Amino acid sequence: MLLCDSLSFFQQLAWHVQLLACLQWLGRSQVLICLPLGSSFSVRDLAQLCGVSETTLSRVVRLTATAGFLQEPQPGQIMHTPLSGAFGGQPSLRDATLFLSNRITPSALQMASTLHLGRTESAAESAYNLAFATSRTFRDACRVTPKLHRQWIAYLRNTGDSDDSITEVLTRLDWAHLGRSCIVESGARSTTRARVLSKLYPALRFVVQLSGPDQDAHDTRASLTPVPSIPGIIQLDENYPHISVQTRNLGLAQPVLDAAVYILHLPSLSVANSPSRSIVVKELQAHMDVLSSNPSAVLIATARVLPPPGSVHREVEAMCRVRDFTLMQLTNEHEPEVADFDDLVNAVEAGGAGRLVVADKLRARNNLLVAFVLKYQEVSAPGALPSSF
């Protein structure tokens, strides 16, 4: 039985390698885009249209068909399946697949070659640098190559880095009892989550704080008018009268002092990413200062954190570990664990007679996202904290 299982594992591995090679070939040759949805197409005509070998195209289709990707309804004809049609109609999936084959796979296969470098956290000494014989870090390459950056973002989104996960976690919290309270969302990339919560709880007021470089990330189609009573804030149109937007860079003082809940979307907590961790500590410090004067308020910090081994469904954990290895191979960073977040909280200087403490943790159902519920607690009054608002 063990021999059979090991043989099956190896054969599945070989199959997936060739599937990825075929998907890369289909992506580069534009076959998926040129093949119309809902009807078959001649192999010969499609090969001529895409400028590829008819024989190779036929062989590629017959292999991917074993995974339900493309089909040969009759000899000499090719047709989309629902799976391949989804790839053909979604540029994000195509970008993610090309990134997987063109960047991640070569980098992953150089991981063992980094052994001779010893224990290094330098972003310029990663498996990616060895694979592409470059001293430029992966993140620098993304900054100067828009296509690479687009594909990287597509890969992240298709491996679980979705705003939907944050929204799903936040909607599980008890907002109803807050009445007409103010909710601040800091480090946001859009007003999407505020709009969802506003529809569910129309009495709540929201202030969405976008970081400076991302200040145009919200829906610019909305009609925006200044709110005279709060300088620097613009308000959305009449469809969302309780949502305001302002610009605020992470780490700066929090200008809204009377909110009931502060939602904070944190950047990477990777131990190797020192600048990012420094910003996180400053941001936690800024909100600790607010909570020390408003101890009834709650801080909800969202971050990507690895689940403890075996604590979630195997497929979910597998994708979390895949993202962790991807970071290691491309940047020498890694996804943090809960203990890493606890270390950052402990690095925040105590304010007055108290400090920040984690009262609860909520994990997304299908990925790395965790919402940490933090409260301000006086050092002289330890004890159990409520697990919700």
From Swiss-Prot:
GO terms for molecular function: DNA binding. This is Geodin cluster transcriptional coactivator gedD. Residues 43-62 bind DNA. It is found in: Nucleus. It comes from Aspergillus terreus (strain NIH 2624 / FGSC A1156). Keywords: DNA-binding, Nucleus, Transcription, Transcription regulation. GO terms for cellular component: nucleus. Residues 13-83 form the HTH iclR-type domain. The gene is gedD.
